[in-house]
């Protein structure tokens, strides 16, 4: 082995040992009570940075009211608490700001398998990831069964997991998260998404969970276990030596085709943003009515994955080729993502030759903004990243300006741009729900107020008037080590909305109930198709 190889091996070995030690240290810290003074310092740290860095802190709560809540929290810190007990108290105060992007994450215990087990666990599926959940009217339902157990009936009520009722978790953790403003449709979708995390906080790392179900007045219990990937077999048992040796040209030709197909599939996944965990594309075009290519459905699951310029170009070229007259844009469950992605989509939907997607964002400080953006990074990284930080700061300063005593910065889409030449000009229908959030709400607002589309579903989880996001640093609290994320920019859609704190409202309100979810029915899409058929 050459010297560089020896050094790399030694470095890898040392890092592995340090990683194991760090995991043990981290898990011990979670179970170590924090001193009262340490918690007081963390509260002061949060309060100071919140007042200094948040661009629209008092939109939904008065300054005196928020100050009183922090003072009250400090006064209740009279005895040591575990970090996650402290998180519950502090997060409940932060949620009163009513900004959905702001989160204070609890510390979740880590599991660090060794050797071959590490690879096995990385390729495995935990018990919670095999199940789908639907939370409605204070009841938890099984919406997906990804296990090998066919006796798990989708649509069953989940009464308890390892003896813990989901209603108790909702009561405990509901005060720690919020939507934008006074919206409530986001809450149920957020809870069912966060549910596995809450159970892990209560139970720790589990390879199996006992679940009590209720179905048609009967109760049954099942154990859901971690599913490991089957080990690869080098050769089939009982295969003769003669069978394994058949080197001729025809099998080689057959092997070439799947390789080409695999390569093409890989490219498609990169362009349209394949999410391996959810097994879906970020952007997917389909034609919901068999034999009718004039009606198209564009499902945009997020604005985070894929190559939007190439993806939307291909999609809208296809719409033009098929002479699509009715386009249904499905934004349900879209939690947002990159501003550049959603702006690109909007440029294909707007009717005018020119457009502006968002207004310049309000910020607290022109000079300090680039340094706020990196505030959550560890101290040792600053010298390493300084060659990149300084040029980035200069670019950031060139985008900022002041007007009437308020500081602003330009964003992607905050200047007037040309619409796409092959933009869609037909009828547009948009599907929304409580999971339509952040950037997805921005485009929904512009399409709604701009009278470009008809909306179906339920009120969006994100506020129609905008959101505080843009750049979201994650700060580590000095003593509790809790991770605190919040936005630095007040991002508003181009079209002004007077009422703050409510989402984009549907023109036709339709809510999917649990039976629809379980049976795979989509009454929202069905209603749109009925209206199109009448036209």
Language-model features, listed with the residues they occupy:
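Alpha-helix-centered segments that form part of catalytic cores
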Residues: 203, 274-279, 388-426
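Extended C-terminal subregions enriched in glycine
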Residues: 427-465
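Charge-patterned, long linear interaction tracts outside catalytic cores
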Residues: 407-423, 433-445, 523-531
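Extracytoplasmic/peripheral linker and loop segments enriched in polar/acidic and small residues
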Residues: 65-66, 70-76, 378-405, 419, ...
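Flexible, low-complexity junctional segments that flank or bridge functional domains
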Residues: 20-327, 331-361, 464-477, 483, ...
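Glycine- and acidic-residue-enriched helix-capping/beta->alpha junction motif
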Residues: 174-179, 325-410, 448
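Short, surface-exposed connector motifs at secondary-structure boundaries
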Residues: 323-328, 423-429
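Bacterial Sec-dependent N-terminal signal peptides
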Residues: 1-27, 46
């Amino acid at each position: 082995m050459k010297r560089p190889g020896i050094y790399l091996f030694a470095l890898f070995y040392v890092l592995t040992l340090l990683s194991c030690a760090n995991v043990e240290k981290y898990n011990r810290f979670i179970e170590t009570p924090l001193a009262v003074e340490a918690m007081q310092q963390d509260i002061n740290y949060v309060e100071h940075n919140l007042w200094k860095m948040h661009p629209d802190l008092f939109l939904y709560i008065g300054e005196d009211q928020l100050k009183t809540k922090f003072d009250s929290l400090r006064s209740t810190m009279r005895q040591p608490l575990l970090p996650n007990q402290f998180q519950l108290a502090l997060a409940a105060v932060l949620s009163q700001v009513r900004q959905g992007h702001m989160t204070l994450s609890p510390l979740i215990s880590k599991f660090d398998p060794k050797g071959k087990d590490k690879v096995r666990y990385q390729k495995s599926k935990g018990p919670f990831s095999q199940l789908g959940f639907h939370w409605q009217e204070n009841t938890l339902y099984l919406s997906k069964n990804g296990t090998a157990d066919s006796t798990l009936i989708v649509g069953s009520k989940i009464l308890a997991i390892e003896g813990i009722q989901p209603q108790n978790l909702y009561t405990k953790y509901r005060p720690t998260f919020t939507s934008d403003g006074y919206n409530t449709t986001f809450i149920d979708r957020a809870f069912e998404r966060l549910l596995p995390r809450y159970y892990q906080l209560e139970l720790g790392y589990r390879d199996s969970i006992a679940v009590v179900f209720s179905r048609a007045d009967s109760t049954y219990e099942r154990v859901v276990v971690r599913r490991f990937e089957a080990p690869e077999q080098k050769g089939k048992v009982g295969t003769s030596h003669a069978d394994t040796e058949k080197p001729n040209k025809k099998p080689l030709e057959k092997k070439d085709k799947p390789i080409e197909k695999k390569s093409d599939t890989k490219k498609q996944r990169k362009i349209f943003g394949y999410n391996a965990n959810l097994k879906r594309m970020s952007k997917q075009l389909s034609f919901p009515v068999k034999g009718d290519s004039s009606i198209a459905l564009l499902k945009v699951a997020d604005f985070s994955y894929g190559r939007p310029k190439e993806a939307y170009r291909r999609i809208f070229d296809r719409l033009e080729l098929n002479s699509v007259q009715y386009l249904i844009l499905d934004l349900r469950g879209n939690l947002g993502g990159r501003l550049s992605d959603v702006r690109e989509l909007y440029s294909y939907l707007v009717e005018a030759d020119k457009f502006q997607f968002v207004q310049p964002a309000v910020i607290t400080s022109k000079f300090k903004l680039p340094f706020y953006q990196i505030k959550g990074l560890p101290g040792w990284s600053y010298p390493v990243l300084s060659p990149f930080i300084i040029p980035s700061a200069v670019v950031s300063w060139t985008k900022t300006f002041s007007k009437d005593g308020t500081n602003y910065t330009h964003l992607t889409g905050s200047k007037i741009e040309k619409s796409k030449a092959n933009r869609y000009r037909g009828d547009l229908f948009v599907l929304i729900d409580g999971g339509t959030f952040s950037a997805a709400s921005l485009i929904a607002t512009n399409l709604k107020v701009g009278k470009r589309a008809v909306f179906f579903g339920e009120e969006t989880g994100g506020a129609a008037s905008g959101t505080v996001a843009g750049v979201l640093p994650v700060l580590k609290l000095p003593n509790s080590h809790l991770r605190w994320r919040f936005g630095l920019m007040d991002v508003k859609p181009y079209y002004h909305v007077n009422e703050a704190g409510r989402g984009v409202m549907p023109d036709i309100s339709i809510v999917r109930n649990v039976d629809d979810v379980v049976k795979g029915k989509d009454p929202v899409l069905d209603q749109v198709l009925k209206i199109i058929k009448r036209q």
